[in-house]
Structure formats: structure tokens, C-alpha cells
UniProtKB/Swiss-Prot annotation:
GO cellular component: small ribosomal subunit
Function of the protein: Binds directly to 16S ribosomal RNA.
Organism: Brucella canis (strain ATCC 23365 / NCTC 10854 / RM-666)
Keywords, sorted A to Z: Ribonucleoprotein, Ribosomal protein, RNA-binding, rRNA-binding
NCBIfam families: S20
InterPro entries, sorted: Ribosomal_bS20, Ribosomal_bS20_sf
Lineage per the UniProt record: Bacteria, Pseudomonadati, Pseudomonadota, Alphaproteobacteria, Hyphomicrobiales
Stated name of the protein: Small ribosomal subunit protein bS20
Source domain of life: Bacteria
Length: 88
């Protein structure tokens, strides 16, 4: 249990950041899910549009520290490869 005022404030800040990060992570997952649906349906146009929405969202999450930048880059790369395979 936090006893000092600074420790209590740190607990409040951590709780607030956790909520923000949860929201960002959920938003990324939603965008990825939409892309997955487009890929599974085989809709090239929808997949490209969804990918263009997913990429900046993932990179934004990386820049905010929600996911590691290498993790975001890896996910973007794998999704791009799947979108490209759909177009081939």
C-alpha cells in the first residue's frame, strides 16, 4: 500500500495510464480484426483500405509505448505480406 503522497500520486498516474493504454491496445486490435475479416472474405479493396488504417494505428501505439516498435513493425510487415498475397 502506498503511504507517501508521492507514492499515492504514482498509483493514480499508473491507473490513469493503464486505462489509456488499454483503450489504445483495444483500438489496435479492432483495426487488425477488421483487416483480418477483409482478408478472410477475399475482398482486395476492403483489405487495402483496412491495411491503410491499421498501419498508422499500430505505429501510433508503438510511439506511445503501448507496444514495442519492433513488435509493431513485425505485425505491419506480416499484415502487408498477407494483403500483397491477396492481390497476387
Amino acid at each position: 500500500m502506498a503511504n507517501t503522497p508521492s507514492a499515492k500520486k504514482a498509483v493514480r498516474k499508473i491507473a490513469a495510464r493503464t486505462e489509456i493504454n488499454k483503450s489504445r491496445r483495444s483500438r489496435v486490435r479492432t483495426f487488425v480484426r477488421k483487416l483480418e475479416d477483409a482478408l478472410l472474405s477475399g475482398d482486395k479493396q476492403a483489405a487495402e483500405v483496412a491495411f491503410k488504417a491499421v498501419e498508422p494505428e499500430l505505429m501510433r501505439a508503438a510511439s506511445k509505448g503501448v507496444v514495442h516498435k519492433n513488435t509493431a513493425a513485425r505485425k505491419v510487415s506480416r499484415l502487408a505480406k498477407r494483403v500483397k498475397a491477396l492481390n497476387a
